[in-house]
Amino acid sequence: MTNSNTRTESHFDYVKIKLASPERIREWGQRTLPNGQVVGEVTKPETINYRTLKPEMDGLFCEKIFGPSKDWECHCGKYKRVRHRGIVCERCGVEVTESRVRRHRMGFIKLAAPVSHVWYLKGIPSYVAILLDMPLRDVEQIVYFNCYVVLDPGDHKTLKYKQLLTEDEWLEIEDEIYAEDSEIETEPEVGIGAEALKALLEDLELTEIAEQLREDISGSKGQKRAKLIKRLRVIDNFIATDARPEWMVLDAIPVIPPDLRPMVQLDGGRFATSDLNDLYRRVINRNNRLARLQEILAPEIIVRNEKRMLQEAVDALIDNGRRGRTVVGANNRPLKSLSDIIEGKQGRFRQNLLGKRVDYSGRSVIVVGPKLKMHQCGLPKEMAIELFQPFVIHRLIRQNIVNNIKAAKKLIQRADDEVMQVLQEVIDGHPILLNRAPTLHRLGIQAFEPKLVDGRAIQLHPLVCPAFNADFDGDQMAVHVPLALEAQTEARMLMLASNNILSPATGQPIITPSQDMVLGAYYLTATRQERSKPEFGDRSRTYANLEDVCHAFEEKRITLHDWVWVRFNGAVDDDDEAKEPIKSETLSDGTRVEQWQYRRDRLDEDGALISRYVLTTTGRVVMNRTIIDAVVTR
């Protein structure tokens, strides 16, 4: 970690999450100011003063602990300006520095009694219960002050280590111990609450237990063996991370930086605050009350009740609703605890740390683009101008259309023809990546050549849908622009849709026509027997070439399923080759005309083909024409 002035740059390879020791928690929050004063402990539940609107000292927003609210200004206003950097005000004790330190400086609350960490107690599995080799129900009875636990049986004959005792049972044993004829010399020791739990965890010698468990595992089987392995795994993890089991019981609680749990003033003079402040306030109030009760030597039952309430307050702060009644705020809304902030899709890890937002990307609904080639996609002009804006601006300046970036942006906003022409030049040969979530295999993200289209929907070739598992009922896809030349080359060589015809999982073709395509091909080439077949030479149904048939169809002179005669000198696949022609006639010039069921050939004297007319439907001509256009490069 390197420091330069006030800026801190951290270089690290990974983040490791493990149990923190009480000393480590204090280190997070405790700081020594330049004048030697130690600060960090939050002792008051107050947040801000309602008259001055400044943070209360030693409270949850204390400027002495967390840093000044305003840049280079202390709490009392004695020091203002950057020239006083690093000075600690003699009057208010606030260090003069930047206000952004309030985003990372922590504090801590020193607890008047230990409390158990709810994650390790009530998590699945319960690590506390596994380590102590006790049922979770029994551990909860101890922590929440329902039962005593024997920490040391002493000379008592019936008591055993870790045995649970109710209030009445312990009173009976006490009477027995302090009776005049008692033979017990070493008194049994019992405990209750998180203090007792901490004592039990401190007694654990992890290395010895691990060795013993390995011996027991070798001689056991079935469910007992599985239980032993589970316990050994937890113990091995504790040994590997140099963590102590008693750290699962907290003596101090870290207070996160105030700017991560802000308090904001609304228009009406009211304040909106983070739920964490309410939860911290509950903990501090109960902690202070417990400390006061202990000072005045209050009855044990009152102190015990306050300890239980402190335990519940800390549980709610760490994970509200995990155990007991959920703490609610206004309108009976559950308060968001630390766990709620970090867990789930909207939590700190998945929302802010793992899933980074990507520049040069967009998202839109997909629609079918039947006229596209397989390696092409239709990109809306509105989206393209935004995604390729830096490239367009660069080219506009290079071509001397504008002089600076500001003028280029104004021109782009007007969407002039010049801009569209430059955009077309930019996207020519620049592949884009289309991704459809969830990306379950590598074909879930493929490269395409963009074609500018009107509207706001991305057009996609129907054949690539199976690879994306996409359909056109409202699916959305994300667009990414590869910027580096290497990325563009990789996209073109490896990720282009026309290069990904086979499934990487099975090796079978994944680009297969289905649904509309199969039905369309069938409908196009189907024949209707009820339609009359024209005689050869019928002017309205005889055409010189395939183009003439297509023109007649476009002009609506014929329909898809009408029979037509069309001149076609290519090979014809039919069943007439082995049969005799229906009619054969020799003309005066020596040529011969043969009439077959679906064709009419004119041959010379040597039997060579001069011309051929075939009887087919308009739809089949259109299909044939489309295939020729696709396959033959003209």
UniProtKB/Swiss-Prot annotation:
UniProt xrefs under Gene3D superfamilies:
1.10.40.90, 2.40.40.20, RNA polymerase II, clamp domain, RNA polymerase Rpb1, domain 3
User: Which InterPro entries does the UniProt record give?
Assistant: DNA-dir_RpoC1_gamma (IPR012755), DNA-dir_RpoC_beta_prime (IPR045867), RNA_pol_asu (IPR000722), RNA_pol_N (IPR006592), RNA_pol_Rpb1_1 (IPR007080), RNA_pol_Rpb1_3 (IPR007066), RNA_pol_Rpb1_3_sf (IPR042102), RNA_pol_Rpb1_clamp_domain (IPR044893)
Provide the top EC class.
transferase
- Gene Ontology biological process terms from the UniProt entry: DNA-templated transcription
Q: Which cofactor does it need?
A: Mg(2+); Zn(2+)
Q: How is the cofactor bound?
A: Binds 1 Mg(2+) ion per subunit. Binds 1 Zn(2+) ion per subunit.
Alphabetic keyword roster: DNA-directed RNA polymerase, Magnesium, Metal-binding, Nucleotidyltransferase, Transcription, Transferase, Zinc
Record keyword Metal-binding present: yes
User: What's its catalytic activity?
Assistant: RNA(n) + a ribonucleoside 5'-triphosphate = RNA(n+1) + diphosphate
Quote a single Gene Ontology cellular component term.
Answer: DNA-directed RNA polymerase complex
Binding locations of Mg(2+): 471, 473, 475
Q: Which residues bind Zn(2+)?
A: 74, 76, 89, 92
Is Magnesium among this UniProt entry's keywords? yes
Q: Which GO terms describe its molecular function?
A: DNA binding; DNA-directed RNA polymerase activity; magnesium ion binding; zinc ion binding
EC number from the UniProt entry: 2.7.7.6
Family recorded in the similarity comment? Belongs to the RNA polymerase beta' chain family. RpoC1 subfamily.
Subunit structure, interactors included: In cyanobacteria the RNAP catalytic core is composed of 2 alpha, 1 beta, 1 beta', 1 gamma and 1 omega subunit. When a sigma factor is associated with the core the holoenzyme is formed, which can initiate transcription.
Tell me the function of this protein: DNA-dependent RNA polymerase catalyzes the transcription of DNA into RNA using the four ribonucleoside triphosphates as substrates.
Q: What is this protein called?
A: DNA-directed RNA polymerase subunit gamma
- Name the source organism: Synechococcus sp. (strain RCC307)
